[in-house]
Amino acid sequence: MAMVPRVLVVDDDPVIRELLQAYLGEEGYDVLCAGNAEQAEACLAECAHLGQPVELVLLDIRLPGKDGLTLTRELRVRSEVGIILITGRNDEIDRIVGLECGADDYVIKPLNPRELVSRAKNLIRRVRHAQASAGPARQALRQFGDWLLDADRRRLIDHAGNETLLTHGEFQLLGAFLRNSGHTLSRDQLMDQIRNREWLPSDRSIDVLVGRLRRKLRDDPAEPQLIITIHGAGYLFTAAASDA
C-alpha cells in the first residue's frame, strides 16, 4: 500500500490553513499546518526525526518575519522536499524569484482547490519517482568538464570535492543536457524532457532553471562555456559526459 502523502501548509492566514487542511485531507493527504517559517522548520525537523518526512510544502510567499522566499532558499540548500509557492495575483516578480530560489511550482490566490490538488499530485509523484529511481543499477557518477554528477544523491562535485545539491528540476534539466550534449534543444524540447509541471506557452521557468543551473555550475551567464544560449533556437550544452 502506498504511503499517505504528508503535506505541510505554511500560511499566516488561519482561514487558508483550515481550508487547505480540510480540502487536502478529503483527498487523502496527511496535512500539517504552520503559521510562520519558524513553526514550519520545527515541524519539518520533527517529522524527519520521526522518520515520517514531509513530501510537499505549500508555502505562502508573504509570511511575517522570515518570508516564504527566504525559507524556500534555506530549505533548498539542505532538502529536496517539493515546494509549491502560494502567491498573490500581482506577485509575478516574486514568483520568478521563488523559482530561482528553488521552488518547484506556484499557485495564485484566490486558490482553485482542484488546480492545487492536481499540482500537488504531480509534484509528489515526480518526487517519489525520482527517489525510487536512485538505485544500485544506475550509473551513479557521470563526469563532464570539471564536474562529477552523483546521480544517486543528486549532487554536483567539483575538482576540490565540494558538493552542491541539485533540485529535482535542475537535476532533470542537467540530465536532458547530458543526454543531448552538442545538440541545440528548444525550450519546448526541454519542457517535454523534464516534465516539471504543466507548462504555459509564456512560461519562463525553463530560463529560470537554466539560470539556476548555470550558477551552480559556476558558468558565467555573460560568457557561458557550458550552457550556451542559441538566440531564437534554445540552449546548447557543450560538455560531453562519460562514466566516472
UniProtKB/Swiss-Prot annotation:
Pathway(s) where this gene product acts: Amino-acid degradation; L-arginine degradation [regulation]
Cite the GO molecular-function annotations of the record.
phosphorelay response regulator activity; transcription cis-regulatory region binding
Its main localization is: cytoplasm
Q: For this chain's UniProt record, which GO biological process terms are given?
A: arginine catabolic process; regulation of DNA-templated transcription
SMART domains, alphabetically?
REC, Trans_reg_C
Post-translational changes noted in the entry:
Phosphorylated by AruS.
Query: Pfam families annotated for this entry?
Result: Response_reg, Trans_reg_C
Please name the PROSITE patterns in this protein's record: OMPR_PHOB, RESPONSE_REGULATORY
Q: Where does the secretion signal sit in this chain?
A: none
User: Which residues does the UniProt record annotate as the domain Response regulatory?
Assistant: 6-124
Q: What is this protein called?
A: Transcriptional regulatory protein AruR
